[in-house]
Amino acid sequence: MTTNQQSVAASQPKTIVVKLGTSVLTGGTLALDRAHMVELARQCAELKKQGHSVVVVSSGAIAAGREHLGYPALPNAMASKQLLAAVGQSQLIQTWESLFALYGIKIGQMLLTRADLEDRERFLNARDTINALVDNGIIPVVNENDAVATSEIKVGDNDNLSALVGILCGADKLLLLTDQKGLYTADPRKDPNAELIKEVKVIDDTLRKIAGGSGTTLGTGGMATKLQAADIARRAGIEVIIAAGRGQNVIFDALSPAPQGTRFLPCEEALENRKRWILAGPAASGDIVIDQGAVKAVVEKGSSLLAKGVTKVLGEFSRGEVVRVTDAQGHLVARGIASYSNQDMAKIAGKHSKDIISILGYDYGSEVIHRDDMVVIQE
């Protein structure tokens, strides 16, 4: 047993989500690297043996489908990707099933779309299912349901999906294993002076600019999506590590007290369950632009958002839908559940709360978003 294995074994039992990207599972080739996959399964099995709960978020369905069909020439269209995903998902899960069986472990497949997370009841059902699997000693293997997901209902990438899965199962740690050692000060593939960032306490615009937007050609996630996932997870109280996913003992190395990667510390005050859903579940239906005074009240004082502070309403949304709250420059300030529709909010924007009933003929309270229904993003 390595030193890192011993340190993980000595730690308190934790729930750990391990996200494995396409580049990790293929090694940059066009086929699944089953020799490396068995090494990853071995480490997950060892974690489970040590008393930890493990959830795997696995990419690779499209790569597996392309391999199984003999690398056909297909048009670059959504239907082609869904075809490959439909064929490849069964191949991928069979591979994981056979590899985990070597260690006496059963797995359970969960295929999710954003629609499963946007509705609060379906969100809770997904949470109950994943927890039931874990409680019964079964390792959930989760992927986005690419065979049926359209752009409207896709989470978009397995980095963000893994953060949502972490919230579903109440994870302590999220490992984002990739083809890079972590987050660098610049792209290490282009800049030889790029330095690895060991620890992150706050995710700001500087970090987002560093992360950029591009990734590998085989997958859909680059470093930018990993940063988004880390931001979601850490706000839910989950520690996140971005680390290299190739080589021996990569999972134990990432979980060690001094991980070989970039560690994102969780926020000191983790969000309550309802606010975790607001942050992670629904896609925002519209934007509410607020003035600087309202920004200060929401961010620094934790106040509800009042109509007086609203300057502009963008998009269409109904009462009860999740919206984005931004400042005049377009920076995201918060996400929350709107107490009024976009039409009503446009009418009362900039008005005093006491005037709402005279303007609309009714009111749903003095707040356009109550603080209990709002997650502040700006730090």
Curated annotation (Swiss-Prot):
Q: Which SUPFAM superfamilies match?
A: Carbamate kinase-like (SSF53633), PUA domain-like (SSF88697)
Q: What is this protein called?
A: Glutamate 5-kinase
Chief subcellular location equals cytoplasm
GO terms under biological process: L-proline biosynthetic process
Q: Please tell me which top-level EC class this enzyme sits in.
A: transferase
Q: What is its EC number?
A: 2.7.2.11
Its annotated function is as follows: Catalyzes the transfer of a phosphate group to glutamate to form L-glutamate 5-phosphate.
Give the UniProt keywords, A-Z: Amino-acid biosynthesis, ATP-binding, Cytoplasm, Kinase, Nucleotide-binding, Proline biosynthesis, Transferase
Q: Identify the HAMAP family for this entry.
A: ProB (MF_00456)
- PROSITE patterns linked to this entry: GLUTAMATE_5_KINASE (PS00902), PUA (PS50890)
**PUA domain: which residues?**
285-363
Reaction catalysed by this enzyme = L-glutamate + ATP = L-glutamyl 5-phosphate + ADP
Q: Indicate which residues the UniProt annotation says bind ATP.
A: 19, 178-179, 220-226
UniProt KW Nucleotide-binding keyword = yes
GO terms (molecular function) for this protein are: ATP binding; glutamate 5-kinase activity; RNA binding
Q: Member of which family?
A: Belongs to the glutamate 5-kinase family.
Q: Which domain of life is it from?
A: Bacteria
Q: In which pathway does it act?
A: Amino-acid biosynthesis; L-proline biosynthesis; L-glutamate 5-semialdehyde from L-glutamate: step 1/2
- One Gene Ontology term, aspect cellular component: cytosol
Residues that hold substrate according to the record: 59, 146, 158
